[in-house]
């Protein structure tokens, strides 16, 4: 047990899917996993372990922002022996080549947060996904006939930015999606010798102001989860 996770030793699989919303974690467990059991619920940050096509997999919420997700990712890795974390969440698009409902695989994550500079002695740290995990996710998407975009995300410290001109800079540098956690999770994984990947669904477009409906989000969210789960199986065979 830790101050933030009340699961017993051995409660988590070596691979954990992590949405921000704990209710999405519950949905994933109930919809996609067999024999799913709740293993933690402190602060209502729900976590479950079950099986997917016979493979033991866990799912747990991580909350909003780098500080929250970093706590859970670190404790899962160092206290529960988790080897791989797949963040599954939503993001906003700033690039006109990206459309709502697109699925993005985040090879890297830029950020305005200073957490990785703190851990990297005030130098820039290239926050990147594990290549094998990204490769497996791309292949899983191809196998299911789902188009994905692969590239850089931007992990923002502020949801309500005071500097909207920054979106112009993001677009110039080819950022595919804006979210709030990937750079932190990649930094934690690097520090503690684990592996991580972020897969996001575009829920809204910052430029066009388009938004997905609740029904549309659910459908595309399911595609993202299927990619993540199938990538775990493919990763086992690589």
Curated annotation (Swiss-Prot):
MF (Gene Ontology): purine-nucleoside phosphorylase activity
Top-level taxon of the source organism: Bacteria
Keyword flag Chaperone: no
Enzyme Commission no: 2.4.2.1
Record-level GO cellular component terms: cytosol
One of the protein's GO biological processes: purine nucleoside catabolic process
InterPro entries the record matches: DeoD-type, Nucleoside_phosphorylase_CS, Nucleoside_phosphorylase_d, Nucleoside_phosphorylase_sf
Keywords, ordered alphabetically: Glycosyltransferase, Transferase
Site residues, Important for catalytic activity: 217
Annotated active site: 204 (proton donor)
Enzymatic reactions: a purine D-ribonucleoside + phosphate = a purine nucleobase + alpha-D-ribose 1-phosphate; a purine 2'-deoxy-D-ribonucleoside + phosphate = a purine nucleobase + 2-deoxy-alpha-D-ribose 1-phosphate
Binding site for phosphate: 20, 24, 43, 87-90
CDD domains per UniProt: PNP_EcPNPI-like (cd09006)
Chain residues that bind a purine D-ribonucleoside: 4, 179-181, 203-204
Pfam families: PNP_UDP_1 (PF01048)
Keyword Glycosyltransferase: yes
Self-association state and partner proteins as the record states: Homohexamer; trimer of homodimers.
Family: Belongs to the PNP/UDP phosphorylase family.
Described purpose of this protein according to its UniProt entry: Catalyzes the reversible phosphorolytic breakdown of the N-glycosidic bond in the beta-(deoxy)ribonucleoside molecules, with the formation of the corresponding free purine bases and pentose-1-phosphate.
Descriptive protein name: Purine nucleoside phosphorylase DeoD-type
Species the sequence originates in: Histophilus somni (strain 129Pt) (Haemophilus somnus)
